[in-house]
Amino acid sequence: MLTLARQQQRQNIRWLLCLSVLMLLALLLSLCAGEQWISPGDWFTPRGELFVWQIRLPRTLAVLLVGAALAISGAVMQALFENPLAEPGLLGVSNGAGVGLIAAVLLGQGQLPNWALGLCAIAGALIITLILLRFARRHLSTSRLLLAGVALGIICSALMTWAIYFSTSVDLRQLMYWMMGGFGGVDWRQSWLMLALIPVLLWICCQSRPMNMLALGEISARQLGLPLWFWRNVLVAATGWMVGVSVALAGAIGFIGLVIPHILRLCGLTDHRVLLPGCALAGASAVLLADIVARLALAAAELPIGVVTATLGAPVFIWLLLKAGR
């Protein structure tokens, strides 16, 4: 038994090391690649200072943090709701952030600065989160709280559809770009949004013990002495914050929160002591690689990153499911 535990521990360490190396390689490639290839030896030249440190580095950091936040949000929701299909958009938090952003675009008539749009997106996500917490205070079961989130998501989606229908052509282009996701406008002015993600990410990665209890199911978690009501509120609030900030930075990026935790579990990473940091590393790497493809696939334009993540990730996910089912 001890030998099996040691083997599993070594395997977990190997996975984390491999994911760390993958993320570092993707980080290096992201800083080098672009319209002009700039090798590490040229990073401290005047050209490198402009392209690498002022343009590519803030974008790369934003991509890493958003990818980690979305993947960890998916892992938290899947444990909290005992549903492998749970992801950040399921509770309506992503759509709530979208409603806040769309309201800011339409009411501000395109004149609001980026920081104001970011605050509106975070406010929309937190409003939906507060509504969910109000439901949670009524001590609803996990399944009913999940259904309440789905209903809120449908309402927010309907509001966004109405807003797009009545928007002008200029607003429509901005809204459609947001709905497909992208990091094209990110620079150091959004550093406050990046800093807003880091404390919550680090805190959640340290909560493996309650997460492991939640993954056992609601009844087992209560029997083990976990204050379920408290942890449900805290985790829903933390997820709402991360999703709101991510939407403010990059718009709507689907698929990552659903697939990354699922793929890691299929690879044997079921303990949240390993799964949570693994999701952060894998999510950051996946979104960063997708962002590189989005930048380089077309010479004259940039692809929406949400389309790239779905196109590249869906076949891999299907293959892993088929492989696991054999």
Swiss-Prot record:
Annotated membrane-spanning segments are 15-35, 61-81, 88-108, 112-132, 146-166, 184-204, 240-260, 274-294, 302-322
Q: Which SUPFAM superfamilies match?
A: ABC transporter involved in vitamin B12 uptake, BtuC
Q: Does the keyword Transmembrane apply?
A: yes
| Biological-process GO terms, alphabetical | cobalamin transport
Q: Which UniProt keywords apply?
A: Cell inner membrane, Cell membrane, Membrane, Transmembrane, Transmembrane helix, Transport
Q: Where in the cell is it found?
A: Cell inner membrane
What's the short name of a Pfam family annotated to this entry? Answer: FecCD
A cellular component term from Gene Ontology for this protein is:
plasma membrane
The main place the protein resides is membrane
Q: List, in alphabetical order, the Gene Ontology terms for molecular function in this entry.
A: vitamin transmembrane transporter activity
Top-rank taxon, per record: Bacteria
UniProt key word Cell inner membrane: yes
- What is the purpose of this protein? Part of the ABC transporter complex BtuCDF involved in vitamin B12 import. Involved in the translocation of the substrate across the membrane.
User: How does the record describe its quaternary structure?
Assistant: The complex is composed of two ATP-binding proteins (BtuD), two transmembrane proteins (BtuC) and a solute-binding protein (BtuF).
> What family is this protein classified in?
Belongs to the binding-protein-dependent transport system permease family. FecCD subfamily.
The protein here is known as: Vitamin B12 import system permease protein BtuC
Highest classification ranks of the organism? Bacteria, Pseudomonadati, Pseudomonadota, Gammaproteobacteria, Enterobacterales
Tell me the name of the encoding gene. Answer: btuC
